[in-house]
């Protein structure tokens, strides 16, 4: 079987539970070789984000050139992009190198609700990046921000917003329903072929730091092994559920701790 080379384009987390660090752990846990391009140095921990230092867009582009000119990249995950010029740099390089299997975790809001992208960056993201992306993975607040619409409060509203996002030009949409008041935590996959509902019981743990990063990285790592997104989503969600179920065995920080990426080994 061909070895999978996976790239993450994202910000950092020195506490190890989210961002680049979580992505690389996820790639390794799922049998993919991980490469990384850093878009922002983030001072954060299990209690929140303290500060963000944005990498110069030219240097983000230089990192992308270094990887794409030398390494066969089979699959890519995009996370925090921080500003308009970084969105533009990433979109341009994806187009230049004809990169396939791109999963975009639409990191747009901090847990506090504060925006992590300016309105101009969101506009560039819609026009330049989304048409090149194979799958986006917004939660409900992120979907609302992308659509400039109210937060979906029901599953029906979630369905309507998922369809609207697909119409914006990306290949597929995985709408995450964790913010709904529903014991099953429904997710919906929207593709050009149809729609599919996924459910999983809520796992009772406070340690959910980096779950969005981890899921999108898992989707990227697993996509080359499947012929469709539905099977990829099913395997990624199952693996993440196991990582969440073992999260309380870790002892990391005094806030919202990380999931256990290496639960299968220790």
Model-assigned labels for residue ranges:
Residues 30-35, 196, 222-236:
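Phosphate-handling active-site elements
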Residues 119-195:
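Conserved phosphate/ATP/ADP-binding segment of small-molecule kinases
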Residues 145, 206-229:
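Short, small-residue alpha-helix embedded
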């Amino acid at each position: 079987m061909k070895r999978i080379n996976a790239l993450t384009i994202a910000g950092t987390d020195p506490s190890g539970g989210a961002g680049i660090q979580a992505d690389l752990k996820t790639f390794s846990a799922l049998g993919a070789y991980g490469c990384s391009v850093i878009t922002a140095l983030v001072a954060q921990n299990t209690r929140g984000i303290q500060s963000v230092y944005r990498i110069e867009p030219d240097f983000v582009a230089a990192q992308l050139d270094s990887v794409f000119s030398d390494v066969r990249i089979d699959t890519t995950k995009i996370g925090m992009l921080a500003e308009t010029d970084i969105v533009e740099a990433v979109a341009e390089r994806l187009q230049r190198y004809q990169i396939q299997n791109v999963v975009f975790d639409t990191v747009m809001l901090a847990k506090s609700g504060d925006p992590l992208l300016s309105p101009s960056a969101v506009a560039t993201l819609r026009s330049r990046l989304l048409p090149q992306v194979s799958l986006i993975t917004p939660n409900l607040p992120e979907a609302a921000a992308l659509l400039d619409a109210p937060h979906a409060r029901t599953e029906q509203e979630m369905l309507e917003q998922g369809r609207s996002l697909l119409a914006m030009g990306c290949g597929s949409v995985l709408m995450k329903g964790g913010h709904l008041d529903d014991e099953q935590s429904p997710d919906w996959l929207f593709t050009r072929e149809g729609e599919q509902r996924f459910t999983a019981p809520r796992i009772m743990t406070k340690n959910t730091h980096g779950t969005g990063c981890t899921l999108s990285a898992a989707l990227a790592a697993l996509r080359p092994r499947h012929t469709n997104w539905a099977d990829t989503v099913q395997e990624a969600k199952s693996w993440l559920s196991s990582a969440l179920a073992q999260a309380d065995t870790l002892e990391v920080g005094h806030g919202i701790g990380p999931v256990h990426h290496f639960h299968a080994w220790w």
